[in-house]
């Protein structure tokens, strides 16, 4: 195993532990707690893949971080922090919407770029609204937390979510996953509308009618790639 991979995992485990302490002391907000839960799943998946114990990795990460802080001058730390842009957290969905359980009559799923696309293909002739919670860096979607598709009545009919055991995803991965989801839902004559935040930060444009800017041919092509759930 590459030593950098081990070091990265150890530091991630220790930083997650520090964030957990903040949460336990009620020193953080809801988006912080939401990311904390998802990152915990991701670390468990990575630990299983790498064959590393989380507690041992956390202790190793603590030593690494402490050594860095001891050797780093305060002035250098201030400069590094000031020059690093802070991501923003965009929330289309409420805590209830993002955590609600949902079920599929005709399940379909596909993995693409570290993301899981799930949809209920029993849904027909509905107006579907796409909502997402994600972080933004440099005015562009950085990390997707969750994207869900809702009917006008509020029922959840599809979802895109990161796979904890797989590495991160890019903006293009998210756009491709949304294209697959749209294609699958439009195959059954559903009308899709994406939130303004999704359009702005994923595609960098705004569509007045709320429709995502994907050409019909791409939607149909992606729809054919959606495979039955095993």
From Swiss-Prot:
Record motif Nuclear export signal, residues: 137-146
Family under the similarity heading: Belongs to the influenza A viruses NS1 family.
Annotated region described as Disordered, given as residue ranges: 206-230
Sequence segments annotated as region (PABPN1-binding): 223-230
Name recorded for this polypeptide: Non-structural protein 1
Domain of life: Viruses
Gene Ontology terms, MF aspect: protein serine/threonine kinase inhibitor activity; RNA binding
Protein's UniProt keywords contain Ubl conjugation: yes
Quaternary structure note: Homodimer. Interacts with host TRIM25 (via coiled coil); this interaction specifically inhibits TRIM25 multimerization and TRIM25-mediated RIGI CARD ubiquitination. Interacts with human EIF2AK2/PKR, CPSF4, IVNS1ABP and PABPN1.
Cell location: Host nucleus; Host cytoplasm
GO BP, one annotated term: symbiont-mediated suppression of host type I interferon-mediated signaling pathway
Keywords: Eukaryotic host gene expression shutoff by virus, Host cytoplasm, Host gene expression shutoff by virus, Host mRNA suppression by virus, Host nucleus, Host-virus interaction, Inhibition of host innate immune response by virus, Inhibition of host interferon signaling pathway by virus, Inhibition of host PKR by virus, Inhibition of host pre-mRNA processing by virus, Inhibition of host RIG-I by virus, Inhibition of host RLR pathway by virus, Interferon antiviral system evasion, RNA-binding, Ubl conjugation, Viral immunoevasion
Gene from which this protein is expressed: NS
Annotated GO CC locations: host cell cytoplasm; host cell nucleus
Major localisation: host cell
Region listing for CPSF4-binding, in residue ranges: 180-215
InterPro entries: NS1, NS1A, NS1A_effect_dom-like_sf, uS15_NS1_RNA-bd_sf
PTM entry text: Upon interferon induction, ISGylated via host HERC5; this results in the impairment of NS1 interaction with RNA targets due to its inability to form homodimers and to interact with host EIF2AK2/PKR.
Function in brief: Inhibits post-transcriptional processing of cellular pre-mRNA, by binding and inhibiting two cellular proteins that are required for the 3'-end processing of cellular pre-mRNAs: the 30 kDa cleavage and polyadenylation specificity factor/CPSF4 and the poly(A)-binding protein 2/PABPN1. In turn, unprocessed 3' end pre-mRNAs accumulate in the host nucleus and are no longer exported to the cytoplasm. Cellular protein synthesis is thereby shut off very early after virus infection.
Domain remark text: The dsRNA-binding region is required for suppression of RNA silencing.
Segments for region (RNA-binding and homodimerization): 1-73
Ranges spanned by the short sequence motif Nuclear localization signal, renumbered to the chain: 34-38
SUPFAM superfamilies: Ns1 effector domain-like (SSF143021), S15/NS1 RNA-binding domain (SSF47060)
Biological source species: Influenza A virus (strain A/Equine/Jillin/1/1989 H3N8)
């Amino acid at each position: 195993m590459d030593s950098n991979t081990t070091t990265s995992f150890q530091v991630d485990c220790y930083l997650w532990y520090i964030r957990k302490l903040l949460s336990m002391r009620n020193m953080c907000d809801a988006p912080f707690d939401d990311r904390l839960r998802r990152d915990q799943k991701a670390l468990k998946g990575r630990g299983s893949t790498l064959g590393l114990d989380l507690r041992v990795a956390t202790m190793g990460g603590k030593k690494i971080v402490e050594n860095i802080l001891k050797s780093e001058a305060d002035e250098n730390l201030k400069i590094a922090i000031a020059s690093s842009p802070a991501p923003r957290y965009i929330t289309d969905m409420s805590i209830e919407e993002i955590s609600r359980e949902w079920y599929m009559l005709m399940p379909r799923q596909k993995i693409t770029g570290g993301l899981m696309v799930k949809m209920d293909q029993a849904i027909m002739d509905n107006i579907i609204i796409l909502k997402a919670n994600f972080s933004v860096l440099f005015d562009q979607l950085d990390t997707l937390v969750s994207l869900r598709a809702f009917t006008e009545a509020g029922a959840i009919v599809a979802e895109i979510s990161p796979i904890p055991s797989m590495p991160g995803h890019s903006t293009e991965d998210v756009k491709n996953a949304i294209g697959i989801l749209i294609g699958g839902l439009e195959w059954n004559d559903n009308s899709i509308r994406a939130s303004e935040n999704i359009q702005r930060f994923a595609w960098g444009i705004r569509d007045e009618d709320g429709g995502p800017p994907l050409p019909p041919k791409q939607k149909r092509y992606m729809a054919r790639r959606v495979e039955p759930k095993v």
